[in-house]
């Protein structure tokens, strides 16, 4: 693994930045760093393919793959460029790499690659679409809520689910959803995290929530709620910068929340005071899930558009984790820890899947990746997750697929929200057989 972004490491090592000093403009990705350079090269390769400038397309896609070798979009551009340049063997190798990472593709969308397909590649493509593994359905909720976040009180097993459709934090009593805390119209509840008797909730206004009015100022708050009474104990917001909060994580000493609109990760030190910017704008396209190691000195953040990042909370160093050759780390949403392993919800790669990533002791490298569950009828747009003992509890079917971008139901009888369970000690090892998102839309 190589050291990324020295300037960012210096910023973080010198101390986090106050929110008030940041500009309020739309998200800008720094062109001098990995994500900015990668995006520029990807655009260059795509334009060159369109213009049939094959040598230029090959060069640009090669440079982009040096930065991000598991990018499905660029692997396909590489295959197209090489096919156009008459380098059939190299083009086939790019296509083989793409499929080896478990991704699927519509063959009809890439007619120029038709001569490359053979029985072995067809077999791999078909295998990549097949379901893997199973999970136990432990809750089914028929009412349309669009469940995003989940939190479990470990001792009692009490389940809390966030809802976007009508903006609420719900508690499950005897298998039935009951509102614990309702939000103002147009404001949805996203990530949830429990710490003692406090339920921390990331909230944001958005089109999917009933009553949303784009003419009104955007709302983004983290709420500290008494999990028993549902009363708000404290509110935390950033008055200086428009935000859209998504995932949240209750760390050993600090709280973290991702802002998918601004591309930043914020920290609430000691669970009090004001937000500090841990990862500033320019380095991630759409930060999502967050999780600390057991010691609480390393934070892993998933960027939907570029993979997983390791932040040393003592030194401020940030490095991107390299994907094993048989997976891509793009499109990962929620994260949780089981021992030294990471459990990841990957809903940006189809079919949807739940992964277990075996990490080195220092969390600097991924030694192996396993697909716990992939596809199947009950797994659709999975979202929030939590490990309780040796069980993974997760939102297997969130109902995101049942609503349009404006929150309108797509059917008079939407499917249920499903909470699933996986016994992490009994799952057999599996080989992941894994197109590529830039950001979760319309989620934060």
Regions found by a protein language model. Name each.
Residues 132-170, 415:
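Beta-strand-rich domains and repeat architectures in extracellular enzymes and scaffolds
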Residues 141-157, 185-207, 238-256, 282-298, ...:
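Beta-rich, blade/repeat-based domains predominating
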Residues 164, 204-206, 260-262, 303-304, ...:
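Short loop/turn segments immediately following the C-termini of beta-strands
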Residues 172-176, 226-231, 269-273, 312-316, ...:
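Short loop/turn segments that connect beta-strands within beta-propeller blades
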Residues 202-218, 397-416:
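Short, conserved, GDST-rich strand-edge loop motifs in beta-rich repeat architectures
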């Amino acid at each position: 693994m190589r050291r990324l972004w020295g300037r960012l490491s210096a910023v973080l090592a010198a101390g986090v930045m106050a929110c008030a000093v940041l500009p309020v403009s739309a998200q800008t990705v720094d062109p001098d760093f990995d994500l900015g350079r990668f995006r520029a090269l990807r655009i260059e390769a795509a334009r060159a393919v369109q213009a049939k400038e094959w040598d230029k397309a090959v060069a640009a896609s090669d440079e982009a793959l040096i930065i991000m070798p598991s990018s499905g979009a660029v692997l396909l551009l590489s295959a197209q460029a090489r096919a156009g340049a008459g380098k059939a063997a190299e083009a086939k190798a790019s296509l083989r790499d793409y499929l080896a990472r478990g991704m699927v593709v519509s063959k009809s969308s890439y007619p120029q690659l038709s001569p490359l397909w053979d029985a072995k590649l067809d077999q791999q493509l078909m295998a990549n679409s097949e379901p893997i593994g199973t999970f136990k359905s432990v809750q089914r909720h028929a009412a349309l809520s669009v469940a995003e976040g989940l939190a479990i009180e470990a001792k009692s097993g009490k389940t809390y689910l966030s809802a976007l459709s009508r903006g609420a934090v719900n508690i499950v009593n005897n298998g039935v959803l009951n509102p614990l805390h309702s939000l103002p119209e147009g404001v949805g509840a996203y990530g949830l995290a429990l710490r003692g008797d406090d339920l921390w909730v990331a909230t944001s206004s958005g089109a999917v929530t009933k009553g949303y009015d784009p003419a009104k100022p955007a709302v983004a708050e983290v709420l500290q709620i008494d999990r028993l009474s549902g009363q708000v104990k404290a509110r935390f917001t950033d008055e200086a910068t428009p935000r859209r909060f998504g995932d949240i994580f209750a760390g050993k000493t600090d709280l973290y929340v991702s802002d998918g609109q601004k591309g930043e990760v914020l920290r609430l030190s000691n669970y009090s005071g004001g937000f500090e910017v841990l990862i500033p704008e320019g380095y991630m396209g759409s930060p999502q899930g967050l999780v600390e190691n057991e010691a609480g000195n390393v934070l892993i953040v998933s960027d939907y558009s570029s993979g997983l990042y390791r932040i040393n909370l003592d030194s401020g160093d940030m490095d991107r984790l390299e994907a094993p050759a048989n997976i891509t780390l793009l499109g990962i949403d929620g994260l949780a820890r089981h021992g030294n392993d990471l459990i990841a919800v990957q809903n940006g790669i189809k079919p949807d899947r739940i992964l277990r990533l075996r990490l080195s002791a220092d969390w600097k490298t991924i030694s192996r990746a396993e697909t716990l569950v992939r596809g199947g009828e009950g797994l659709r747009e999975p979202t929030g997750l939590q490990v309780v003992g040796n069980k993974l509890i997760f939102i297997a079917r969130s109902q995101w697929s049942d609503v349009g971008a404006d929150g309108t139901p797509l059917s008079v009888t939407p499917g249920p929200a499903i909470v699933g369970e996986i016994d992490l000690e009994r799952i057999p090892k599996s080989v992941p057989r894994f197109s590529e998102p830039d950001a979760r839309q319309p989620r934060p």
